Curated annotation (Swiss-Prot):
SUPFAM superfamilies: Class II aaRS and biotin synthetases (SSF55681), Nucleic acid-binding proteins (SSF50249). Binds 3 Mg(2+) ions per subunit. This is Lysine--tRNA ligase. Belongs to the class-II aminoacyl-tRNA synthetase family. The gene is lysS.
Length: 518
């Protein structure tokens, strides 16, 4: 039997398609289509009768400490399938690196083990082909865990060549547009989305253990509400009515609190017809949760614990690195008012200046903020302070920080403070200079809520496209009585960006929105 000795570094790079480098993709595809035609003639083009018994990563982990002699003494028969990422043909012995959904493992192939006909066929296979093998687990002379193949099959022919292994998808937009290729050739991309799934699973478990019930509320709304944002519109043909893709589930979730479900949450998509940036995607994922008989202080403690646990479950630690800077989620999160944050990062501003509307408008102009925009026409000091905060302090909030005491005029659904006029029991959580969460003690006074909705309508009529509509049914629900409650929304995509050290929201959404291809 041929002794399995791995090729050394001098061997030619087999990661590239086994054709001349100068050949363009069209010629490669023509050759591969011819190979597929031959397979069709043989009646074996796309078989579906192979069932794997093992996964690569499980074998690598379980037998990491097993030496060559131990594997020979207790031979393990395995069946593995995956995509061929490397191929080295060396006369009477060949190697292939095959990657399945868990990881990768090496196949060792000889004509003695698989038969000359199969071996000759294997030599014609290409990088990217989906292959399968049965065989015995062993370790090569150089120590690599491998499968000595006794049966080898081609399950699916790859017609398009994979990108060069050393460069992958160099075009960032192409990574997003052809995510399927990115996932094939970029292990870090796959790790990102595995971490995303783990984080979401952790959140669901955390909520269940806190006695929250997961619910589903409508995606199509007759009236958009729950956030200040511009909605997508559509038309329901059967009902002949305009509908809106939801911008937030908040008002429906609070209807459920009225109905007696005291702790509810939903993880789902929201849609906002706004710009695209490294922080914004028109379609994004959030968790929103509501708990009766709690307030914004309880929410801050709960949200802090939730995020910390999500990091531990997804990454194994609460200490992470984001864009080269360490971030310790195990430490207590900071809490600052809007004015405290401004003065921390822009200490030149005095209390008197921050209480002066005229001064704030003048100062905002220096930052290029047009104070004549509809949302600023009748803005009070609180709104202007918030705008200045966004220009001076927001991007500086690297460590987890709750900004509290938001003005009523920008918080139409939040409960007013009993202690300080003009502000609400609301917070926003910032980490790495980005908003991660928004929560508050809920406004459950139907008359107060109706009055605030009317002010929002006035703002909309004045030209503010993001102002809220008047939702009469929600007011009706509140009139039946809603218990005191707290509610919070957390941006899942931004949270995952932080956990996976991803600079753009597109890096953590499998298929982000892009301009149409020309």
């Amino acid at each position: 039997m041929t002794e399995p000795t791995q090729p050394n570094a001098a061997q030619p790079d087999a990661a590239r398609p086994n054709v001349a480098p100068e050949m363009d993709d069209n010629k490669i595809m023509t050759e591969r289509r011819e190979k597929l035609r031959e397979l069709r003639e043989q009646g074996v083009a796309y078989p579906n009768d192979f069932r794997p018994t093992h996964h690569a990563e499980d074998l690598q982990s379980q037998y990491e400490q097993s030496d060559k002699e131990a594997l020979e003494a207790n031979p393990l028969e395995v069946a593995i399938a995956g995509r061929m990422m490397l191929k080295r043909v060396m006369g009477k012995a060949s190697f292939a690196t095959v990657r399945d959904g868990s990881g990768q493992i090496q196949f060792f192939i000889t004509p003695t083990d698989v038969g000359q006909e199969t071996y000759d066929a294997f030599k014609k296979w290409d990088m990217g082909d989906i292959v399968a093998a049965r065989g015995v687990l062993f370790r090569t002379n150089k120590g690599e865990l491998s499968v000595r193949c006794t049966e080898l099959r081609l399950l699916s022919k790859s017609l398009r060549p994979l990108p060069d292994k050393f460069h992958g998808l160099a075009d960032q937009e192409m990574k997003y547009r052809q995510r399927y290729v990115d996932l094939i050739v970029t292990p870090e991309t796959r790790k990102t989305f595995v971490a995303r799934t783990k984080a979401i699973s952790s959140i669901r478990k955390f909520m269940a253990e806190a006695d929250f019930m997961e619910v589903e509320t409508p995606m199509l709304h007759p009236i958009p509400g729950g956030a200040a944002a511009k909605p997508f519109t559509t038309h329901h043909n059967a009902l002949d009515m305009q509908m809106f893709l939801r911008i937030a589930p908040e008002l429906y979730l609070k209807r459920l609190v009225v109905g007696g479900f005291e702790r509810v949450f939903e993880i789902n998509r929201n849609f906002r017809n706004e710009g695209v940036s490294v922080r914004h995607n028109p379609e994004f994922t959030m968790i929103e949760f509501y708990a009766a008989y709690t307030d914004y202080k309880w929410l801050m403690d709960f949200t802090e614990q939730l995020i910390r646990q999500a990091a531990i479950d997804a990454l194994g630690t609460a200490t992470i690195t984001y864009q080269g800077r360490e971030l310790d989620l195990a430490k207590p999160f900071h809490r600052l008012t809007i004015t405290q944050a401004i003065q921390k990062y822009a200490p030149q501003y005095t209390n008197e200046q921050l209480a002066d509307s005229a001064f704030l408008r003048t100062e905002l102009k220096k930052f290029g903020v047009d104070a004549s925009q509809p949302q600023f026409l009748n803005a009070g000091v609180g709104s202007l302070q918030l705008a200045l905060f966004e220009e001076t302090a927001e991007s500086q909030l690297w460590e987890p920080t709750y900004i509290i005491d938001y003005p009523i005029e920008v918080s139409p659904l939040a409960r007013a403070s009993d202690k300080v006029a003009g502000i609400t029991e609301r917070f926003e959580l910032f980490i790495t200079g980005r908003e991660i969460a928004n929560g508050f003690s809920e406004l459950n006074d139907p008359e107060d809520q109706a009055a605030r909705f009317k002010k929002q309508v006035d703002q909309k009529e004045a030209g503010d496209e993001e102002a809220m509509f008047y939702d009469a049914d929600y007011i009706r629900a509140l009139e039946y009585g809603m218990p005191p409650a707290g509610g919070c929304g957390i941006g899942i995509d931004r949270l995952v960006m932080m956990l996976t050290d991803s600079p753009s929201i597109r890096d953590v959404i499998l298929f982000p929105h892009l301009r149409r291809e020309d």
